[in-house]
A protein has these predicted regions:
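Short, flexible helix/strand-to-coil boundary loops that buttress conserved ligand/catalytic motifs
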Residues: 18, 118-122, 149
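Domain-level recognition of soluble alpha/beta enzyme cores
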Residues: 124-156, 161
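Hydrophobic packing residues within well-ordered alpha-helices of enzyme cores
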Residues: 61-65, 91, 117-118
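Non-DNA-binding regulatory cores of transcription-related proteins
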Residues: 98-106, 111-134, 142
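Active-site-proximal alpha-helix that buttresses catalytic centers in soluble enzyme cores
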Residues: 2-81, 127-128
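Short alpha-helix plus adjacent loop in nuclease-associated cores
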Residues: 82-95
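Short, well-ordered alpha-helical microsegments
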Residues: 58-59, 88, 114-115
């Protein structure tokens, strides 16, 4: 069995017209929510390496998580260009190529890719929208990432900033 941890980047800033999408940072709410989510997640799970989108808002979200969850900051995190996508199909293909030695993956990415992926993998759970800085833990009934398919997962846990 595999476990997939999905976290949408925290609320991004839109106050600089003309700034490329990849370069947008976080607004005040995003800066507040990321550490709070890190602190809340630290009470529930062990720290692990995170793979994040190269978008600045995803990187700042990871930094905020680590401020709220210092042990997470001690893990080796990576940035992967494949996570800068808004397509669930692209994200699905990216996951199929993961190393099977990884039993759990924690990724920070973007909507609508994350919501659509969660709904495809956990069909019966029907998530309307993964909010900014929202977290999902999915249990996948597979032994190999390449065997991932629609309906192979259940949402085991969710946490959204408004719950804190």
């Amino acid at each position: 069995m595999k476990t997939l941890h999905l976290l949408r980047h925290a609320k991004s800033a839109w106050d600089e017209p003309g700034l490329p999408d990849r370069e947008r940072g976080l607004n005040k709410r995003g800066e507040r929510d990321a550490p709070r989510m890190g602190e809340a997640l630290s009470r529930r799970m062990a720290p692990m390496a995170v793979v994040a989108s190269p978008a600045r808002r995803a990187q700042l979200t990871l930094e905020g998580l680590c401020r709220g969850w210092p042990a997470l900051g001690e893990c080796d995190h990576t940035v992967d260009e494949g996570l800068y996508t808004f397509s669930a199909d692209d994200l699905f293909r990216w996951l199929l190529d993961r190393d099977d030695r990884q039993q759990s993956l924690f990724i920070i990415g973007h909507n609508p890719a994350l919501t659509d992926l969660a709904n495809a993998l956990a069909e019966d759970d029907g998530l309307a929208n993964l909010p900014t800085a929202g977290y999902l833990q999915l249990a996948l009934q597979i032994d190999h990432w390449r065997d991932m398919r629609q309906g192979c997962a259940q949402i085991e846990f969710s946490l959204f900033p408004r719950q804190l």
